[in-house]
């Protein structure tokens, strides 16, 4: 009887050969590219007079460096304009499908691919971006890769990788009202640590995961990399299939029937052998906020920032650095920390469901006069849907700036940046030093609903006070 995990099954299906040294050559089913990590890869192909091996398995969009305040061409930022033009040229030359600004389907690559039905169970997916693990929410195995591997996939449709171990993270019970997928994944990373996943794929499972919507599952898998894992995935189920059905790039008619039959066979066996199993009680998770300079440094809304004596020797070193950088003191409560900027968006939390929950918190309320707040839809499709539902007006009426799709302040490669030592309440995925554009800017990660609550009060707040 088979004892394979979904990871084992997908890996073996895509294994081309065993390479000298013990790594495997893995076929990539879908290659996603964008304007930042692809130019050098295309340049390397040109230097060797090579073509893209399977252009029909490659899809491009622009997201990282695009402005969100004004997307009229040419951009004011000459570098951004040059990078977009380069991607346009490369896609045209190699006959690659490209979702450009104004196509109706442009946006953050990890938002666009699922909403178009490109992301499907059983796939191997690669992209020159660390949050490619997002696509594992559909039962695919998705890896972030570097520019040299982007080159390899363009040229051969394969990459060389060592097979990962698999850790199952079993989440019992279900999340309480006012607690979201972002809170759960921050809690998981805090419990396990930011390096615990090195060499692992994370399989998220259990009743709490089953309860989540597909967009919430994407949030969980998106931040696998923040826990050190190369990828994270969830076994596909009826929610998965319903989400994909009738999407623009989903299989149609008899091809859908064939795909569905295969997808239903793709799950970890009941007696799968895991390299490690972790069990957590999701019902005990509360709204969670990061206080430090790694996503693992988080606490519940009513908790105090840890004392040094309560930390391990390794954690003490990072904590001391975080106290100084963030201007926090050990034992200080995170609640009521003043914030200067509130950002809702990113590939972690820039989807329509994220905007809906934030809008519910903001409706008939006003952003604090001391706060600059802006919302950046994850894609043109998300923006269109939000406008049809009137969400954009709720945001604007409250005092949020409504922006155009892009990665924006998640990594601050455009003009959306913190200034000086501003404190940001952010729905993004990383709180490293300088991550949001200012060398001394400070980032507090939280759910979109928590960002909305912080925007109203001008300080870190418990969103349950707004929705219960």
Swiss-Prot record:
Cofactor annotation remark: Binds 1 [4Fe-4S] cluster per subunit.
Amino-acid positions noted as binding [4Fe-4S] cluster in the UniProt annotation, renumbered to this chain: 347, 407, 410
Catalytic activity: (2R,3S)-3-isopropylmalate = (2S)-2-isopropylmalate
UniProt pathway annotation: Amino-acid biosynthesis; L-leucine biosynthesis; L-leucine from 3-methyl-2-oxobutanoate: step 2/4
Domain of life: Bacteria
InterPro entries with a match to the protein in the record: 3-IsopropMal_deHydase_lsu, Acnase/IPM_dHydase_lsu_aba_1/3, Acoase/IPM_deHydtase_lsu_aba, Aconitase_4Fe-4S_BS, Aconitase_4Fe-4S_dom, IPM_dehydratase_rel_enz, IPMI_cat
Coiled-coil annotated residue ranges, if any: none
One MF term in the entry's GO annotations: metal ion binding
Similarity comment: family membership: Belongs to the aconitase/IPM isomerase family. LeuC type 1 subfamily.
Biological function: Catalyzes the isomerization between 2-isopropylmalate and 3-isopropylmalate, via the formation of 2-isopropylmaleate.
Protein name stated in the entry: 3-isopropylmalate dehydratase large subunit
Organism: Prochlorococcus marinus (strain AS9601)
Gene behind this protein: leuC
């Amino acid at each position: 009887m088979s004892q394979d995990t979904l990871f084992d099954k997908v890996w073996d299906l895509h294994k081309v050969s065993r390479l000298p040294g013990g790594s495997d050559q893995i076929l990539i089913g879908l290659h996603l590219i964008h304007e930042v990590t692809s130019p050098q890869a295309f340049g390397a192909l040109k230097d060797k007079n090579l073509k893209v091996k399977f252009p029909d398995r490659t899809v491009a969009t622009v997201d990282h460096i695009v402005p969100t305040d004004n997307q009229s061409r040419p951009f004011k930022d000459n570098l951004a304009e040059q990078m977009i033009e380069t991607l346009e040229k490369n896609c045209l030359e190699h006959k690659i499908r490209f979702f450009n600004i104004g196509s109706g389907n442009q946006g953050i690559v990890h938002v666009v691919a699922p909403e178009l039905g490109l992301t499907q169970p059983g796939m191997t997916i690669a992209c020159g971006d660390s949050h490619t693990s997002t696509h594992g929410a559909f039962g695919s195995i998705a890896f972030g890769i570097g520019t040299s591997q982007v080159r390899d996939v363009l040229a051969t449709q394969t990459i060389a990788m060592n097979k990962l171990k698999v850790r199952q993270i079993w989440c019992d019970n279900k999340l309480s009202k006012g607690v979201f997928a972002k809170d759960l994944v921050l809690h998981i990373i805090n419990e396990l640590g930011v390096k615990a996943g090195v060499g692992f794929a994370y399989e998220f499972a259990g009743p709490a995961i089953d309860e989540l919507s597909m967009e919430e599952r994407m949030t969980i898998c998106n931040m696998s990399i923040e826990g050190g894992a190369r990828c994270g995935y969830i076994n596909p189920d009826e929610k998965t299939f319903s989400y994909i059905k009738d999407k623009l790039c989903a299989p149609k008619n008899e091809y859908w029937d064939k795909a569905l039959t295969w997808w239903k066979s793709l799950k970890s066996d009941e007696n799968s052998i895991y390299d490690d199993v972790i069990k957590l009680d999701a019902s005990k998770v509360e709204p969670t906020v990061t206080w430090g300079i790694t996503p693992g440094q988080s606490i519940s809304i009513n908790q105090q920032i840890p004392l040094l004596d309560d930390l391990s020797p390794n954690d003490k070193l990072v904590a001391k650095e975080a106290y100084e950088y963030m201007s926090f003191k050990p034992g200080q409560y995170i609640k009521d920390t003043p914030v200067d900027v509130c950002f809702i968006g990113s590939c972690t939390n820039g989807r329509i469901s994220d905007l809906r929950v934030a809008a519910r918190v903001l409706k008939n309320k006003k952003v604090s006069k001391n706060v600059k707040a802006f919302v950046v839809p994850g894609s043109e499709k998300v923006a269109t849907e939000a406008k049809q539902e009137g969400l954009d007006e709720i945001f604007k009426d409250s005092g949020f700036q409504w922006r155009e799709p892009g990665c924006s302040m998640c990594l601050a490669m455009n003009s959306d940046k913190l200034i000086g030592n501003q404190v940001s309440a952010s729905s993004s995925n990383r709180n490293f030093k300088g991550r949001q554009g200012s060398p001394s800017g400070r980032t507090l990660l939280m759910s979109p609903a928590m960002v909305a609550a912080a925007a109203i009060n001008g300080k870190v707040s418990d969103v349950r006070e707004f929705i219960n």
